[in-house]
């Protein structure tokens, strides 16, 4: 999958957010809060985790570029492709990487389902508003810290968000279908 340009990034986000949202909307409400095992997240917890992990993306996209440069620096390496970033993420997970505490959800009730779906889709709307304001070259220039992947470019952060949403969709489909 060749994803590089801003319209492709937006399209990838829209597709994965829509598929995840549709799947969750069609899941019976009583299953939204139930976990298949104590160490596994419920569908609601997966959704809450995705919201928690998408909010910083919006923060980065709205942050002045001089602040990004001052806080984190600029890229000095070859940028990873979508596929290479996904492979690095899978490798980190295989090595035992997990969500750090700020991104771990607490119990989520079935009553929160539609509020969380709305909040998740609102995060996508914010990305879709902010991302086109970026110049393509700046997506590759500025870097930000990622708790599992280290310093990554803003484009790689968007790659991650596309894949991360897909990863959680596939997980809940496997665990709760």
Task: List the predicted regions and their residue ranges.
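Short, contiguous alpha-helical
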Residues: 33-86, 125, 131-177
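Short, helix-capping/interhelical loops that line the mouth of catalytic, cofactor-
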Residues: 1-8, 56-119
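Hydrophobic packing residues in well-ordered alpha-helices of helical domains and bundles
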Residues: 6, 13, 116-120, 158-161
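Amphipathic alpha-helical packing segments from all-alpha helical-bundle domains
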Residues: 22, 120-130
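Charge-rich, low-complexity N-terminal segments
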Residues: 2-5, 9-12, 23, 31-47
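Residues that cap or delimit alpha-helices
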Residues: 27-28, 135
């Amino acid at each position: 999958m060749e994803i590089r340009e801003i319209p492709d990034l937006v399209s990838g986000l829209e597709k994965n957010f829509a598929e995840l949202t549709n799947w969750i909307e069609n899941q019976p409400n009583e299953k939204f809060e139930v976990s298949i095992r104590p160490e596994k997240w419920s569908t609601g917890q997966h959704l809450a985790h995705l919201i928690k992990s998408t909010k910083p993306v919006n923060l980065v996209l709205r942050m002045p570029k001089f602040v990004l440069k001052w806080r984190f620096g600029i890229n000095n390496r070859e940028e990873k492709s979508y596929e290479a970033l996904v492979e690095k993420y899978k490798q980190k997970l295989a090595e035992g990487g997990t969500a750090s505490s700020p991104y771990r959800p607490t119990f989520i009730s079935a009553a929160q389902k539609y509020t969380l779906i709305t909040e998740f889709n609102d995060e996508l709307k914010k990305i879709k508003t902010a991302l086109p304001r970026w110049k393509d070259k700046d997506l590759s220039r500025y870097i930000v810290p990622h708790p599992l992947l280290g310093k990554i470019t803003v484009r790689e952060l968007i790659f991650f968000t596309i894949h991360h949403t897909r990863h959680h969709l596939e997980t809940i489909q496997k665990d709760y279908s």
